[in-house]
């Protein structure tokens, strides 16, 4: 199994434990993680430094999360810059967040512009052998986050993959397994985000649209059917990354170790 986690988690771990980022990266590797998800905005201008950090820990780039604003502007320069970074860091995938609604926006019109921007991005990426995926973002201002919205976008952008985030559908009160069935054949990347209804290490949590408090949890220990999701992916022949995600965990090292152990042992 190809397990990854986020550079943001390593930075949180570093701050929590008072250790260097290099030490945090090595802890990830020792935990059974082989890939790291980067953020374009945090990495731009520091590519060589990031590559050296990951190389030293025996880690590779799993993907690059990039925020666009296709609903309000054409962004050819950002498209090319993100693709340049992906090639420089040997990243096979860019996870695109295409843009958000602003007050007064016409949702339907913005959604069409987001689809057009994603089609442009996918066309440019295909020329470089890079894949593009988009996740179900957990924000009310993201008109591509609910399962039907995600399906609509996938239909409008044939080359777009689904970065399936297991936790974000719960934010909208949607059933993750129903969402899975709707997008299964387009899943090219997975964010393994488990959620609990109580904190484990003093986490503040996030309030869902159903007014339910949701807290990050080590993968396999929360309220979501993570084992069933992995089983379905495995039976389908999915061979992509499983990205451990629990931002704002009270103890990132503990969460990371438990999550990686659960994933690496699930088929043993």
Language-model features and meaning:
Residues 1-92, 119, 126, 161, ...:
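N-terminal pre-domain/capping segments
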Residues 5-9, 38-42, 63-68, 96-98, ...:
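A cross-domain feature marking catalytic cores of carbohydrate-active enzymes
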Residues 12-16, 35-49, 68-77, 102-105, ...:
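Acidic-and-aromatic substrate-binding clefts and catalytic sites of carbohydrate-active enzymes
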Residues 21, 47, 75-82, 111-114, ...:
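Aromatic/hydrophobic pocket-lining residues that form the small-molecule binding cavity
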Residues 30, 56, 60, 71-162, ...:
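Active-site acidic/histidine proton-transfer and metal-coordination neighborhood
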Residues 35, 93, 189, 240-241:
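Residues at the N-termini of beta-strands
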Residues 36, 120-223:
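Acidic/histidine-rich catalytic cores of soluble enzymes
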Residues 55, 59-60, 146-158, 220, ...:
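Short, electropositive alpha-helical surface patch
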């Amino acid at each position: 199994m190809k397990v990854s986690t986020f550079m943001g988690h390593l930075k949180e771990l570093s701050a929590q434990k008072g250790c260097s980022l290099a030490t945090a990266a090595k802890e990830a590797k020792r935990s059974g993680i082989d890939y790291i998800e980067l953020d374009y905005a945090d990495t731009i201008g520091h590519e060589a430094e990031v590559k050296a950090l990951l190389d030293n820990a025996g880690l590779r780039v799993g993907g690059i999360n990039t925020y666009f604003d296709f609903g309000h502007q054409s962004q050819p320069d950002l498209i090319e810059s993100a693709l340049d970074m992906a090639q420089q860091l040997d990243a096979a995938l860019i996870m695109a967040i295409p843009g958000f609604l602003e007050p007064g926006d016409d949702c339907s019109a913005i959604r069409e512009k987001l689809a057009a921007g994603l089609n442009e991005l996918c066309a440019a990426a295909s020329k470089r052998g890079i894949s593009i995926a988009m996740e179900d973002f957990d924000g009310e201002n993201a008109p591509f986050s609910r399962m039907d919205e995600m399906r609509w976008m996938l239909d409008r952008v044939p080359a777009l993959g689904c970065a399936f985030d297991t936790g974000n559908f719960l934010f909208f009160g949607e059933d993750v397994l129903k969402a899975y069935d709707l997008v299964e054949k387009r899943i090219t990347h997975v964010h393994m985000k488990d959620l609990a209804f109580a904190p484990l290490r003093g986490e503040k949590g996030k309030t869902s649209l159903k007014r339910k408090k949701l807290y990050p949890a080590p993968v396999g220990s929360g309220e979501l059917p993570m084992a069933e999701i992995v089983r379905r992916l495995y039976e389908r022949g999915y061979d992509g990354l499983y990205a451990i995600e629990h931002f704002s965990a009270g103890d990132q090292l503990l969460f990371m170790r438990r999550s990686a152990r659960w994933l690496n042992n699930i088929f043993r």
